[in-house]
Amino acid sequence: MRIAACLLALALVGCAAEKRPERKLDDLFAARRADDAARALEARQFIDAILKRTEGKAQAAAKAGPGAAPPTIDLLVISGGGDWGAFGAGVLKGWGRVKGGRPQFDVVTGVSTGALIAPFAFLGDDASIERVVQLYRAPGDDIATSRGLLFFLPNNPSFYVLPGLERALGTALDRPMIERIAAAQGNGRGLLVNTTNVDLGDMHAWDLIAEAKLALASNDEDRVRRILLASAGIPAVFPSRTIGDYLYVDGAITGNILYGGRTKEGEGLAAQWRAKHPQAPMPLLRYWIIFNNQFRFPPQVTQERWPDIMGRATIMATQTSTMNSMRHLFAMAQIAKLKYDVDIDVRVLAVPDEWVPPKPGTFVPEVMNELADLGEKMGADPASWRSDPP
């Protein structure tokens, strides 16, 4: 009995996460104020860059004459959804078969599994899209592995570790790919992924182009992958990630789609355009939302066991929050049309409500491949996109 107790004690010590140093509350409040100011400055700089790119497109269209195609600003918004990100990866591949192909997106944003997809969507060529499709089609047996029989102990940093995902992401998003992302700095395009800073208690949207350049300069390209893994780090289930002085987890906690919902009145792209160009028409603004989920889940009998209840309720809470964010975006678009006389389209593509996974569980290859197939089929059909709020 004593031997068993000693072994258990050793196991507990071995599983414990290293304790992080405490900080005074006043210091944390000051750090949050500084972080808020930094995020606000980044947001203004981002809007300025997109505005400049929009002006360039409008000028090019004016020079081309009346027969030229009207200019557009295309924003791709990729939601979270765990292993259902296979659907979004498939959508991007199928979209490439549409006449004219995928747009070159001016802005790509991603959250959680959408953050893993976003860099490949931003690069946009067929080879990059195929890389992310294979990331989901061939997950591997060790994509997520339990920490063992004592995974639930409170000193553990998470229930699971992600050796397979970390390895696959390192292969797919290698240094040459990161160099291509960094090379986009200065052309007005944007690549943003959302995380949650659990220390400061707020979202943190990362400019992945700037981060790619910083990572290359410091010879630490793994920094980019840490940001993506943080965005996909379901709290307690998957490992959190320390970046700089702070701890980051799943971006879906503070926003499962990243669409500018916190932009203050008068500071958005449409408002800035109208203030600077009172009489000039603004290029069409198109939001493309890939929702790696369903608007309504299939009904089921949920057993009175805490894992079943918590799992179902957590997924429903995230889904409902995301749908409310989408409704907010549709409302923002309507207000901008009325107030600033600009054209804004919002289009959404989601897993059909009637679709049922062929097998239970997460990271099941049969499920992920069926979702990828479904995404390819729907992505290749322009009629799959809906233009009304969910």
What are these language model-derived features?
Residues A11-G14:
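C-terminal motif of bacterial Sec signal peptides marking the signal peptidase cleavage site
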Residues A16-D106, F122-P390:
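Patatin-like phospholipase
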Residues G82, V111-S112:
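Catalytic nucleophile serine of serine hydrolases
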Residues I117-F120:
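Hydrolases whose catalytic domains are alpha/beta-hydrolase-1, hotdog thioesterase
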Residues M1-L7:
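Sec-dependent signal peptide recognition
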